[in-house]
Amino acid sequence: MMSVDNLSANIVESPKFRKTYLSLLKKSVSSQIPALISTNDSGDIEWAYLISCASLLFGSSDGSVLDIAYRICQAAICEPTLPSEYKNAAAGIFALSANNAAITLSVSRALLAPDFNEYLPLQANIDIAKKQFSNSIIDNDEIFVLNEFQKEVYTSFQDNDAISISAPTSAGKSFVLLHLLSNFILEAHNPKIIYIVPTRALIQQVEMDIRQHLKDSNISATVTSVPVLPGDFNQSSCVFVFTQERLQWVLSEHTDINFDLVIVDEAHKISDNSRGILLSQVLQKVSYMGNCKFVFASPMSENPGALFRTIKPTYAKQEIVSEIVTVNQNLIWVSKDGPSTTKWRVELLAEKEKIQLGYVVTERITKTSMRLPILAYRISAGQTGNLLYVNCASEAERVSIQLKSLILNDKPGYQPSTRVCELIKLVKKTVHPDYALIEVLKAGVAFHYGNMPLAIRNEIENLFKRGDISFLVCTST
């Protein structure tokens, strides 16, 4: 009997599927670039055929195949002229794969009817109900439905002393880690938990996320990033958000301390220089000091089981490697079209090749330093949610200023939202009246890097999510 993976491979390699899917891919990605002048005539899409294929492909364990299935269903739901029965079928496939986030987002954007399941066959609804039930957990009397990867993590954590997780960034690691943490607090007696982050820049953000999650779950616990034991240490549940250096400080000051759970985020960095060596040392020390559970989380690590070398060999261990896809990412290559300085060729890097989509036209770009801001601004064509990565803080400020000039040249009467004006007042008061951020905010632009006050960084992120800030230029921190 042919396996699901073999069947999926046969489908995606068939000439008919490749031709039909390529037409869909070009049309779908091109529609997301407003300024694109398309050079493709995708013709009519065989939606019934592609959605039927997607229903089979979602059973594959191959990440690249899952990406194809997800693209088909996402494109169907986003296609404005497509009859509702096709959209409902695509949503049903998402539901069967427990991808509830995709459904929720589609409904919130009015791309999908909230009651889509009422139009599905009875057997499909029975299968969806069984899947939702089997992937559900109860956390503090509230039911949460997990995707396949999250459910595997949750179950493995219950059955083992240590687990090592490797999955793409979009798989939902942060969500399941927070629920593991909160459920552990509920089930254990005043547990002591360490959540290790790789850099100081992440400490406050993770601490705030944990505080908010516990508050939303109505769970009482002391959450701190200060390497000093709180006064009620023995009488309360405690969560410490540390770097390895802060954990080392606590271990040196309290040689008899025991912890119950250690979560190591970005655990693959254990192989990085001297800080990785220190992390390995403190983890090994904690593992020999008592009966502590460990969770290692990494983005697509080739050998997540290697992290178990840092803890006691007697631990019951399990590694979890997943290629689960919950979102699509389009890698677009933009290059000069011949000698022209105003015409830019746009290609999609997918299916192990460059796929020609079309071109965009900009004003004449004579300076290399203006290439990123001009292309980003023209390609976005006024849409919000534009995130630009640069190498350093000074470059983030420079690109933001250039974007501001482009926006105000096109829209001289631009007025920022009330929330942005309030942020401008806060920056003037808490940082400096002449801080460059103030001027770029007036055009709906912001920059973001690690060495900024947390309150300002958080508000920038919130305004970007709301659409009050159209362009956010940031560094990796």
Mark where each language-model region is:
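Walker A/P-loop
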Residues: 145, 160-180
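SF2 helicase catalytic motif II
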Residues: 244-247, 252-294
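N-terminal pre-P-loop "Q-motif" helix
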Residues: 142-159
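Conserved interdomain linker/interface between the two RecA-like ATPase lobes of SF2 helicase motors
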Residues: 231, 284, 291-402, 446
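Motif I (Walker A/P-loop) of helicase-class P-loop NTPases
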Residues: 149, 173-182, 275-282
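Structural recognition of the conserved hydrophobic beta-strand(s) that form the central parallel beta-sheet
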Residues: 195-196, 240-243, 263, 292-299, ...
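N-terminal accessory nucleic-acid engagement/regulatory domains that precede
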Residues: 1-130, 381
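Conserved C-terminal RecA-like helicase domain
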Residues: 125-136, 149, 155, 164, ...
